[in-house]
């Protein structure tokens, strides 16, 4: 498969994720769409790395996945805290949380 096709796929995935972030109000769905956008960026990094014949993009994608794993833990903890306090996972309720 041509590496340009992977870039088209990455652009499509990023667009789907951005649309989900802008349209949906459920925090879990918004969080999943953000992860989809992050994975689209990883796919673009790997495709550019493959096109240019070096490993820099693959290394960046690996470190991005490591950071995304930590982001998942923190993000889900915030969503669980929001759900326990408000009995809703709506993004609109997140502004009501206090420290």
Swiss-Prot record:
Superkingdom field: Bacteria
Keyword Transmembrane assigned: yes
UniProt keyword Protein biosynthesis present: no
EC numbers, comma separated: 7.1.1.-
Gene Ontology cellular-component annotations: NADH dehydrogenase complex; plasma membrane
Enzyme class: translocase
Gene3D superfamilies: 1.10.287.3510
GO biological process: ATP synthesis coupled electron transport
UniProt GO MF annotations: NADH:ubiquinone reductase (non-electrogenic) activity; quinone binding
Topological relation to the membrane, as annotated: Multi-pass membrane protein
Catalytic activity: a quinone + NADH + 5 H(+)(in) = a quinol + NAD(+) + 4 H(+)(out)
Localization: Cell membrane
Keywords of this entry: Cell membrane, Membrane, NAD, Quinone, Translocase, Transmembrane, Transmembrane helix, Transport
TM ranges: 3-23, 28-48, 59-79
InterPro entries reported for this sequence: NADH_UbQ_OxRdtase_chain4L/K, NUOK/Mnh_C1-like
HAMAP family xref list: NDH1_NuoK
Record PANTHER family: NADH DEHYDROGENASE SUBUNIT 4L-RELATED, NADH-UBIQUINONE OXIDOREDUCTASE SUBUNIT ND4L
Family under the similarity heading: Belongs to the complex I subunit 4L family.
The protein's assembly and partners: NDH-1 is composed of 14 different subunits. Subunits NuoA, H, J, K, L, M, N constitute the membrane sector of the complex.
Function description: NDH-1 shuttles electrons from NADH, via FMN and iron-sulfur (Fe-S) centers, to quinones in the respiratory chain. The immediate electron acceptor for the enzyme in this species is believed to be a menaquinone. Couples the redox reaction to proton translocation (for every two electrons transferred, four hydrogen ions are translocated across the cytoplasmic membrane), and thus conserves the redox energy in a proton gradient.
Annotated protein name in UniProt: NADH-quinone oxidoreductase subunit K 2
Organism: Streptomyces coelicolor (strain ATCC BAA-471 / A3(2) / M145)
């Amino acid at each position: 498969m041509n590496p340009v096709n992977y870039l088209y796929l990455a652009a499509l995935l990023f667009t789907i994720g951005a649309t989900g972030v802008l349209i949906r109000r459920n925090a879990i769905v918004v969080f999943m769409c953000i992860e989809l956008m992050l994975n689209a960026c990883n796919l673009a990094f790997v495709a550019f790395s493959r096109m240019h014949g070096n490993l820099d993009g693959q290394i960046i994608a690996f470190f991005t996945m490591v950071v995304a794993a930590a982001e998942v833990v923190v993000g889900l903890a915030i969503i669980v805290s929001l759900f326990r306090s408000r009995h809703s996972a709506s993004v609109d309720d997140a502004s009501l949380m206090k420290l």
